[in-house]
């Protein structure tokens, strides 16, 4: 546990300071390969080596032993469009103070978990996903969720996967408990091909089996962190349209809009999470919503691809171009660096 904490802290501080492994290895008189293993938490490390690395990073050695991630909730599903990769960029533009936090296109909720707002309204059209989130509000549902996930882990096989996948075709599917629906969503997310959520035209999940002999559906420490956070906060969980989700937003509230992204002119970019899609007109409607919220005096931040349409729609607002890695795509070749924008009205 300690070597993972130290390794993770070394890596994070090094990246924050924008220095290479080669530089740290040279200054600390280490082999670069050894430093890489240390950062991965794969090797034991002496206090003398920690001290050398701390000196190379110009930080107090105690900083490398702090478990900064202890009890900090993180996304429990892998989700297309997830923001874990650009969290450091997003955090640069968070308002210093705000009242209620709104995230109407939640997905995995990377920014939501990173901010841990005391008051929040979270929403996603995917009712399966939001049932999983609702399990963290109720102790009985929470423990049942864990019980069901353990069962999925033990039964995992290709045949079992497809039997679980077909459940939403059943007429009485929505009579199931939130923990059963939530556990199904999480299991399918962990066991499916490439962690990709996709629905067919009828609204049924249709991603094939990922051919994993063993699946780990949950991290108990993270689940407990999420459960404790929800218990100590006022979180309203919805599964409705984004317009409905933000209708009560007021002055000094903070709204983060992370819609399905606009496509590039060459039609690249995985944006079809659900059966309804999100076309150019939907992007225009969202831009009007952005302006409406701005006129209310709310803080609004939006993420999207850096396309001509998005540049046109948000003229007059603060547009910052960043580079991000696309981590989930139906084709492995569709992953790589892409230009995104972070747009704010402040």
Regions inferred by a protein language model and the residue ranges of each:
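Short basic helix-loop element that most often maps to the first helix and adjoining turn
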Residues: 8-27, 52
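Recognition helix of helix-turn-helix/homeodomain-like DNA-binding domains
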Residues: 29-43, 66
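DNA major-groove recognition helix of helix-turn-helix/homeodomain DNA-binding modules
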Residues: 46-63
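S-adenosyl-L-methionine
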Residues: 70-100, 110
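SAM-dependent nucleic-acid methyltransferase catalytic core
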Residues: 71-85, 138-256, 260-270, 285
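Conserved proline-anchored active-site loop of SAM-dependent methyltransferases
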Residues: 90-93, 101-115, 122-126, 186, ...
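SAM cofactor-binding core of SAM-dependent methyltransferases
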Residues: 99-166, 216
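Conserved acidic-Pro-Pro-aromatic motif
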Residues: 251-338
């Amino acid at each position: 546990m300690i070597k993972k904490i130290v390794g993770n802290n070394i890596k994070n501080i090094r990246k924050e300071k924008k220095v290479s492994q080669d530089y740290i290895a040279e200054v600390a008189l280490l082999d670069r390969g050894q430093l890489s293993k240390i950062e991965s938490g794969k090797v034991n490390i002496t206090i003398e080596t920690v001290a050398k690395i701390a000196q190379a990073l110009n930080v107090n050695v105690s900083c490398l032993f702090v478990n900064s991630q202890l009890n900090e909730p993180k996304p429990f599903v892998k989700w297309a469009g997830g923001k874990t990769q650009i969290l450091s960029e997003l955090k640069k533009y968070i308002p210093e103070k705000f009242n209620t936090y709104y995230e109407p296109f939640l997905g995995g909720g990377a920014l939501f978990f990173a901010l841990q707002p005391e008051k929040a309204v979270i929403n996603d059209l995917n009712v399966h996903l939001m049932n999983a989130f609702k399990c963290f509000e109720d102790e009985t549902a929470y423990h049942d969720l864990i019980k069901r996930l353990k069962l999925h882990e033990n039964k995992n096989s290709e045949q079992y996967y497809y039997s679980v996948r077909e459940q939403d075709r059943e007429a009485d599917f929505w009579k199931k408990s939130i923990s059963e629906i939530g556990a199904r969503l999480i299991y399918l997310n962990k066991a499916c091909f490439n962690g990709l959520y996709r629905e067919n035209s009828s609204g049924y999940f249709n991603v094939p089996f990922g051919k994993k002999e063993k699946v780990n559906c949950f991290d108990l420490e993270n689940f407990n962190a999420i459960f404790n956070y929800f218990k100590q906060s006022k979180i309203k969980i919805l599964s409705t349209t984004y317009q409905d989700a933000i209708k009560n937003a007021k002055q000094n509230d903070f709204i983060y809009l992370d819609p399905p992204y606009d496509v590039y002119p060459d039609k690249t970019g995985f944006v079809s999470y659900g059966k309804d899609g999100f076309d150019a007109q939907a992007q225009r409607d969202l831009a009007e919503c952005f302006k409406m919220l701005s006129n209310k005096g709310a803080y609004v931040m939006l993420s999207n691809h850096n396309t001509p349409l998005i540049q046109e729609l948000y003229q007059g607002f603060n547009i910052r171009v960043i580079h991000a890695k696309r981590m989930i795509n139906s084709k492995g070749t569709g992953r790589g660096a892409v230009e995104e924008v972070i747009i704010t009205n402040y």
